[in-house]
Amino acid sequence: MHYLALFFAGAFLCNSLPHLAAGLRGEPFPSPFAKPPGEGDSSPLVNFFWGLFNLLAGGYIVSTHPLVFGINPDFLTVLAGVVFLGGWISVHFGRVRSRKGGK
């Protein structure tokens, strides 16, 4: 259970980045609350709060499962969550953007 929690911490922390960045830049960006979910654009404010939620969720998990940076199973598990979700959402949002006419 410990490693599953750390994997999700990495996924939450990774997912916070594009949403916080879009929200803070004042740009719309797809979110789970858009229509259709994950493809339509949500407002910058929605993205800011969704990114903040992900940041807090990932931070909470890491705070309850202390993490030492370095080559160790805990850190590599968090990194696996970052790599898995980062790879998946980069491909997903690349497809979404190309369907919208690229940018």
Write out the residue ranges for each language-model feature.
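Membrane-interface extramembranous regions
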Residues: M1-K103
